[in-house]
Amino acid sequence: MFADSAKIFIRSGKGGDGHVSFRREIFVPAGGPDGGDGGKGGNVIFEVDEGLNTLGDFRLKRKYSAGDGENGQKKRCSGKDGEDLIIKVPEGTIIKETETGKVITDMSHENRREVILRGGRGGKGNQHYATPTMQVPKYAQPGQKAMELNVTLELKVIADVGLVGFPNVGKSTLLSRVTNAKPKIANYHFTTLNPNLGVVDLDGADGFVIADIPGLIEGASEGIGLGHEFLKHIERTRVIIHLVDAASTEGRDPVEDIEKINHELSSYNEGLLLKPQVIAANKTDVLYGEEEEEAINKIKEAFESKGIKVFPISAVSGQGVKELLYYVSDLLKTVDATPIVFEKEYFPEENLVMSEPYTVEYNETEEVYVVEGPRIERMLGYTNIDTEKGFEFFQKFLKENGILDQLEELGIGEGDTVRMYGLEFDYYK
């Protein structure tokens, strides 16, 4: 079954905890701390797989987790890093944060592989915390927590030309005639429930990729029927071909059909109407003489004044199809060929960390002030507080984020101890 959207849960690996231990060997009475570091958690990586053309696999499995880092061990042994998780998707897949709908990344064109969630940093063992004044550190740094995210995957086909029209106007028939695609063809509304792609080869001219966008109905832009599922596939195309039933075999007016579809395109995304359009007036094989001329002229009068070319064709007999294809090939040369790639709007590492608050509490049992939270943990992970510059940055961070104010509100005094993820400091103004 073709599937062009799916919602899944992803989780990176947690960092392993640093270890607290001391060297215990004969003839070495005071060997000092030798706790090893925790391993790094695995990343969640998305990768394009050329062999995939659907998101159907994600209907069977909804939760994906990378490996956790192992904890550190004694004798300075570091824990093993967690295994990365590689999730393979078809080219053209857009990854969005589910709650906001913002784009995390677009897996198309040059973007073939991207880390979406990074694994947690491994905690430092107590071997790192020995100082001249603290030779027996009995604490180690815990591993950084895993990152979790609900994401929506959307597959938007990549084609030069989008073929649009109401059900039963002959899109599948035309596609099967001009390409090697083998779409199912039947006279039922919504027979085509997935975009069919085909390559048009032309003698002496540039070929192109064409996508048969499944039949649209009024209200598609509001999600009626399978509207949103279909309309999104038009966003990557560079030229739109309107296929209409010029013979009105089902009683519809072809001019009204085009206007209705353009209304749906505009309601979904106004930018779609900026794409060049061509009209293929189909089923002329069932019209004769003045009847055909009258039907075609009616369409031309409505649209050629707007710069939209009209081609009378028959998808069944092939009449007029070659002229249509060569015109579209020439038209594509005038259209910007820059790949349509959706820009990033959501940055998991930044958004997830900044959205979670920190806590400042007093532990009466240990008589220590404890500061925790992803922002604190991340800051400590990339700041070397053993250097003068790093320590100045650390102090500035505490002040700008209101942590010092909260400590004072809790009644901290000179010389009191503050703990942050295995690190302890004495408080002085």
From Swiss-Prot:
Subcellular location: Cytoplasm
Binding annotation for Mg(2+): S172, T192
GO biological process, one term: ribosome biogenesis
Main EC class the enzyme belongs to: hydrolase
Cellular component terms per the entry's GO annotation: cytoplasm
Named cofactor requirement(s): Mg(2+)
Endpoints of the signal sequence: none
Keywords, ordered alphabetically: Cytoplasm, GTP-binding, Hydrolase, Magnesium, Metal-binding, Nucleotide-binding
Family matches, as Pfam families: DUF1967 (PF09269), GTP1_OBG (PF01018), MMR_HSR1 (PF01926)
Binding sites annotated in the UniProt record for GTP: 165-172, 190-194, 212-215, 282-285, 314-316
GO molecular function per UniProt: GTP binding; GTPase activity; magnesium ion binding
EC number assigned by the record: 3.6.5.-
Domain OBG-type G: 159-333
Residue intervals of the OCT domain: 350-429
Main localisation: cytoplasm
Residues covered by the Obg domain: 1-158
Family: Belongs to the TRAFAC class OBG-HflX-like GTPase superfamily. OBG GTPase family.
Self-association state and partner proteins as the record states: Monomer.
Function: An essential GTPase which binds GTP, GDP and possibly (p)ppGpp with moderate affinity, with high nucleotide exchange rates and a fairly low GTP hydrolysis rate. Plays a role in control of the cell cycle, stress response, ribosome biogenesis and in those bacteria that undergo differentiation, in morphogenesis control.
NCBIfam families hit by this protein: Obg_CgtA, Obg_CgtA_exten, PRK12296.1, PRK12297.1, PRK12299.1, small_GTP
Name this polypeptide is given: GTPase Obg
Name of the gene encoding the protein in the UniProt record: obg
